[in-house]
């Protein structure tokens, strides 16, 4: 988070950007009061006009801590506490943010256009891995939220709502240490990792950026799920 804030600060200080266009803020998305506070700040910063809300956060790790399963430690609240946090950040926060941002996203007059909401889901909403119950539930819930809010907010305010479903996107090198070491995004990937994808490579962050940009600019698309996974979910698998 601090690295992201530092990068945002660098962008605002460069000669080719508008200083008022960027702002970074650390927010605890499990805390509803913090969410409400930051939305008020965003409203003031952008003068009540928001083009796009992108819901992307999740409480890592995606699995239960210490390699545990959902059926372990039944006498303890540890698993349930993790569940509550992951669902709060991964599903409740996007719903609350969407609600609170409607006044900024909706059309202000006949000459203006409404903004849009883009929810980042995951192929894990449809394909499971061991011990991903909370992650899969949150990402599956995001798809339901997208469909329902696209209809509600579309009819009432012309706000478009879509979801992006990423597959394997390599983010291991998207951090401060990798930036300082000039690490390439694909470092650590094997040829087998890449060839497993019909598209010929593992996904990178820019692939999601391009999908987001496409949906922001496409004003006749709403309620849709855009899969960005290099074709993996279309493959048939057989036991070896």
How should each PLM-predicted stretch be described?
Residues 122:
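Residue(s) in the substrate-gating loop at a strand-loop-helix junction
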Residues 71-95, 118, 135, 142, ...:
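Catalytic Tyr-X3-Lys loop
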Residues 98, 138, 146:
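Active-site helix of classical SDR
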Residues 36, 58-84, 103, 107-113, ...:
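Conserved mid-core segment of classical short-chain dehydrogenase/reductases
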Residues 114, 155-160, 222-224:
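Short, small/polar-rich loop/turn modules that mediate ligand/substrate recognition or access, typified
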Residues 40-44, 58, 85-111, 150-155, ...:
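Amphipathic alpha-helical dimer-interface segment in Rossmann-like NAD(P)H-dependent oxidoreductases
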Residues 201-228, 233, 239:
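C-terminal substrate-recognition "lid" of short-chain dehydrogenase/reductases
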Residues 128-136, 148:
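Active-site loop-to-helix junction immediately N-terminal to the catalytic Tyr of the SDR YXXXK motif
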